[in-house]
Regions:
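Short, hydrophobic/aromatic alpha-helical segments in well-folded domains
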Residues: 15-18, 34, 85
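Long, charged low-complexity segments
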Residues: 65-171
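Charged alpha-helical initiation segments
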Residues: 1-28
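Hydrophobic packing residues in well-ordered alpha-helices of helical domains and bundles
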Residues: 12, 31, 79-82
Length: 172
């Protein structure tokens, strides 16, 4: 692996670290928003080779494969619930999206600054601290899968150059 490739892979590790830093700084709304951006990015990278843009099903598949809560949590993530929550937050900064209005079986997410989720039949109060930890764990699991699965790695590597990178600039 070239140094350039290593830097691009490291950019994904840095996303998880930035997510944790944002949360640690007390920026709950920013951390929540960036959490969904992280999932979007990973689901884009994992697309089948023949696809160039992601769809709802790609996001849900990535969530169902990689995003796992602690076994003791009263709510375990479901791709459709997380996708609807993502749409609600990113498109309306809300808890309700069109998917919730069309399908009452899709659970609404509310958020609190603690760690333990609270689950009710139609509403889940997501502990942001746990959600952040779970997303970072999902990123790590995805990166491990990329390392171990040559076919997955071959799909991901060409897309890494499209992921936003930041570079330090030193003033003269």
């Amino acid at each position: 692996m070239s140094a350039e490739q290593a830097n691009m892979w490291d950019g994904l590790v840095q996303m998880g670290k930035e997510l944790k830093r944002t949360h640690a700084a007390g920026c709950m709304s920013a951390a929540l928003t960036f959490a969904y951006v992280c999932i979007d990015t990973m689901s884009y990278l994992s697309l089948p080779s023949e696809k160039s843009h992601q769809e709802r099903s790609d996001f849900m598949s990535w969530v169902d494969t990689y995003l796992k809560g602690e076994p003791s949590q009263p709510y375990q993530y479901h791709g459709l619930d997380v996708y609807a929550a993502r749409c609600a937050v990113l498109h309306a900064f809300s808890s309700e999206a069109e998917l919730h209005r069309k399908d009452p079986g899709v659970r609404l997410f509310g958020y609190h600054d603690g760690g333990r989720h609270v689950s009710h039949p139609h509403l889940v109060l997501i502990g942001i601290a746990s959600f952040i930890d779970d997303i970072v764990g999902a990123i790590e699991a995805f990166l491990a899968a990329c390392r171990d699965d040559a076919a997955l790695r071959a799909r991901v590597e060409p897309r890494l150059v499209k992921v936003l990178q930041t570079f330090p600039i030193q003033a003269p």
